[in-house]
Every structure is written in structure tokens, then in C-alpha cells.
């Protein structure tokens, strides 16, 4: 894909990457001065990933950043003072001092979902955001990031499967920064490219140099445009390097020095500066003006953060429970939805006590003559399908369950091809006969075991 960026957009990319770099370097100094009370998870050396991917989005699109995506927050318009005060747990921070790291978002204006500490869980969440936007006809794209370590979680695969099955307008950025805390990616997965995992779900994927902001932007723009056009989800693996430890308390002594040296020579900002100069997009004066602008802005924002007060103690008792922010009429009912699905005769927010899992619980109660208790929720997968599908299809009345037909025993057996009589291709034979695969892996052991 050709580079469609204008000169102004090229300079924008530099501005946001350098703003990201200078902001985080200041926070490192504040951390060492004990002015940052929480953890500090640096994205130094990875600025091209967050900036390049988020810059490919439209204003109406949604993001869910992770701990190393400060650059995406800046591109979305979050002021540096919010990032400073958030990490310093000040009363003026987005969470009013209740969080000392990056757990904050902006749902109403900037369409930012707060990071979730449980790695991988943002994938199904943002898939749901993408599906909701499509349902409402908003033509949005939802995007989130995950690290190489987080790609080993169950939620990663569950979320991708859901996104693929629903053809959601969702983009996943896999940040392969070589290390999950102290575990190298080669000790985590048996494949060379994490993007290969997308094949299992029929998802389109890209592999790009994560330190080349133009390559990152181009891949993200192509993926976002295709998602918006209705072609389903996309996955982009960006190969980069975490140039610090997992957090500021981690000296990263487990990383080979030569590895740091290699990636330091490929610093994303220095590479981009060289690109801008060689292509005559800027000159030394333009660079100096942008750098000076960033320094002035950060001076003001940091001063505001340092002079801001800490939260009052009584604030700890507020915001613990929902106080009218979600219109729920009864403790056991679903929240009242704003819209009813088209073609559905059931009002949004119908009562569930007579359907699905609730009806099953009532049947069990009658059998064991135990008192009934209305459960507050049902499983979002199987029981959710039990509740919604038969009701909607029958116009609001639960359908009778069809009679269960016994399955003949022979249909449960997996057909096997005797070794030597099946396909000539060795890999196919091994896939159909796992025992032979083990034997081939251990030719000296006839039993196929070590």
C-alpha cells in the first residue's frame, strides 16, 4: 500500500512520537523522585506502535489502550496533564487519585475504554464495542492492543473467535516486543510469527516493522479501512522491542546487551527523523520548532500536575457502587436498553424469570423441593442463547424443546486411516494418526515416548 500521508500528517506523527517520548522520560524522573505513587510501565522505544496505529483511526472510532500505549492516548486528544496527574494520584486526575497508573478512559468524548489488568480481556470487550457500533449503524472500528505475553491467554483466543464468527469491525494490534516480563517470546510460543494465529480464525493479518511508523500506519490504515467496509476483523503483529524492564522497578538484567544494542540502533524516532530529512519533508528549523513546542507544553502540564492537591481521605468512600449511572429497575432484571433490536417483538429489558436458566432452576427446585432464589445473571454464552433465541423466534413466548434424538454409537467414532494406507503426504498421515507422529519425533524409541 502506498503512503498517502501529507506533509502535515508526517509532522503530526513526529510530534506525537516525540511528545510520547519526552512525556515518559519526564515521568521516569518523577518516579525516581518518589512523585509517582503507582507503577510506571514504559513504552520508550515503542512509540511508533501506539502513534502509528491510532493515527489511522477516525475520531468516532474506539480504542482500548494497554499499559504501554500512552502515545495512543495523546493521539486521541488526552492532555499530558491527565497522564501526569493520573500516575501521581492527584485529585485533579481522571480518577481523582484513585489509581496510580494508566487505568482510566473517556467513554463520552474521546471513545477510550479504560485498560483492564487481566491481559486479553479487552479483546472480547472491544469486539462487543465493534458489534454495538455496527448494530447502531455508526460505521465505527474498535481497536485494542495486546503484548506477546498476553497473546497466550485464553481470552485472546476466545475474543478472536468471537470477532471472527461475528465479522466484527475490530482490529487487534499484537505488540511483539520480545519479552513478557522476563520470558522471551521464543519460550512462549512454538511459532515464528504471532500473526500466524489469525489463520486459525480466518482473520486477515499483517506483519510489520514496529519501529517504522510509516509501515505501522500503512498497515493499520489498510486494516481499519477493510474493517469499516465490512470485511471482518483484522490482526497486525508489530515487531518491536521493550527498551526498559517490565516496569521501572525491573532492571531487565535478563535481556542480552547485544539485543539492546541492536534495537537501540533502530530507534523509531531517529529512523523517522532520518526519513523526514532524506525525503525533504522538513528541515532543521522545523524540527527545532516542534521540539520547542513540546517542551513548552510539557513544562506547563507537569507544573499543573505537581501543584495539584492529593485527594481528600473521605473520597475513598465515594464511587464504590453505582449511583444512578445505569438505569436498572430491579436487582434481578436486565438493564433497560435504549433500543429494541429490529424485528423483535420483545421489549428491551424483558424479565428473565420464566425463561432459560431461570426456568431450569425452577424445575430443579420443584424436584428437590428447595426454596427458590432468583439468580442475578445468566451465563453470557450458552444460557444467553437459550434465553434469547427461542423467545425472539416465537414472538415472545418460549418454544417447546424439540425431542432429543439418540445418536448412534458409530457416528461418535473418529475415522482413522491405517498408517501406510492413507494419503501419501507425510504431514497429513501424522495429523490423522498422532501415534505415528510421536514415533517420527523419536525414531529411536519404538513406543513413541522419551
Please give the residue ranges for each predicted region.
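Glycine/aspartate-rich loop-and-adjacent alpha/beta segment that forms the canonical ThDP
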Residues: 226-363
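Cofactor-binding active-site loop characterized by glycine-rich and histidine/acidic residues
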Residues: 25-28, 35-166, 184-190, 195, ...
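A short, conserved beta-to-alpha structural element at the edge of catalytic cores
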Residues: 166-186
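Short acidic (Asp/Glu) and glycine-rich catalytic loops that position anionic groups and cofactors
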Residues: 30, 60-65, 175-176, 197-204, ...
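Conserved thiamine diphosphate
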Residues: 131-138, 190-222, 265-291
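Intrinsically disordered, Lys/Arg-rich low-complexity segments
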Residues: 385-449
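Short gly/pro/ser/thr-enriched loop/turn and capping motifs at secondary-structure boundaries
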Residues: 71, 178-181, 215, 242-244
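N-terminal glycine-rich anion-binding loops that anchor highly charged ligand groups
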Residues: 15-31
Amino acid at each position: 500500500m502506498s503512503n498517502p500521508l501529507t506533509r502535515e500528517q508526517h509532522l503530526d506523527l513526529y510530534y506525537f512520537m516525540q511528545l510520547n517520548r519526552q512525556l515518559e522520560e519526564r515521568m521516569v524522573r518523577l518516579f525516581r523522585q518518589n512523585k509517582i505513587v503507582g507503577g510506571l510501565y514504559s513504552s520508550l522505544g515503542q512509540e511508533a506502535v501506539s502513534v502509528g496505529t491510532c493515527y489511522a483511526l477516525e475520531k468516532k472510532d474506539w480504542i482500548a489502550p494497554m499499559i504501554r500505549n500512552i502515545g495512543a492516548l495523546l493521539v486521541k486528544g488526552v492532555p499530558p496533564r491527565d497522564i501526569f496527574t493520573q500516575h501521581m494520584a492527584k485529585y485533579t486526575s481522571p480518577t481523582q487519585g484513585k489509581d496510580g497508573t494508566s487505568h482510566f478512559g473517556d467513554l463520552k468524548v474521546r471513545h477510550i475504554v479504560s485498560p483492564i489488568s487481566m491481559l486479553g480481556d479487552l479483546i472480547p470487550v472491544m469486539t462487543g464495542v465493534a458489534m454495538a457500533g455496527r448494530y447502531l449503524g455508526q460505521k465505527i472500528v474498535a481497536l485494542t492492543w495486546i503484548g506477546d505475553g498476553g497473546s497466550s491467554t485464553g481470552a485472546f483466543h476466545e475474543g478472536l473467535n468471537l470477532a471472527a464468527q461475528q465479522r466484527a469491525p475490530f482490529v487487534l494490534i499484537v505488540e511483539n516486543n520480545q519479552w513478557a516480563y522476563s520470558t522471551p517470546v521464543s519460550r512462549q510460543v512454538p511459532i515464528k510469527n504471532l500473526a500466524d494465529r489469525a489463520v486459525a480464525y480466518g482473520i486477515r493479518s499483517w506483519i510489520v516493522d514496529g519501529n517504522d511508523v510509516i509501515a505501522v500506519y500503512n498497515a493499520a490504515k489498510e486494516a481499519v479501512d477493510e474493517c469499516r467496509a465490512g470485511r471482518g476483523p483484522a490482526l497486525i503483529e508489530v515487531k518491536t522491542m521493550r527498551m526498559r524492564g517490565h516496569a521501572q522497578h525491573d532492571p531487565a538484567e535478563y535481556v542480552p546487551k547485544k539485543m539492546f544494542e541492536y534495537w537501540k540502533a533502530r530507534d523509531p524516532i531517529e529512523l523517522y527523523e532520518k526519513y523526514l530529512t532524506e525525503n525533504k519533508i522538513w528541515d532543521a528549523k522545523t524540527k527545532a520548532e516542534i521540539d520547542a513546542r513540546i517542551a513548552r507544553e510539557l513544562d506547563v502540564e507537569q507544573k499543573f500536575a505537581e501543584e495539584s492537591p492529593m485527594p481528600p481521605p473521605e473520597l475513598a468512600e465515594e464511587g464504590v457502587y453505582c449511583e444512578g449511572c445505569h438505569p436498572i429497575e430491579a436487582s434481578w432484571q436486565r438493564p433497560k436498553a435504549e433500543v429494541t433490536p429490529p424485528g423483535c417483538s420483545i421489549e428491551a429489558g424483558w424479565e428473565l424469570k420464566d425463561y432459560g436458566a431461570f426456568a431450569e432452576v425452577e424445575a430443579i427446585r420443584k424436584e428437590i423441593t428447595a426454596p427458590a432464589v432468583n439468580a442475578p445473571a445468566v451465563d453470557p454464552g450458552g444460557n444467553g442463547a437459550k434465553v434469547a433465541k427461542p423467545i425472539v423466534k416465537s414472538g415472545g413466548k418460549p418454544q417447546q424443546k424439540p425431542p432429543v434424538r439418540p445418536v448412534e454409537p458409530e457416528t461418535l467414532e473418529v475415522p482413522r486411516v491405517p498408517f501406510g494406507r492413507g494419503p501419501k503426504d507425510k504431514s497429513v498421515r501424522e495429523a490423522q494418526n498422532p501415534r505415528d507422529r510421536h514415533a517420527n519425533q523419536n525414531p529411536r524409541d519404538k513406543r513413541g515416548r522419551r
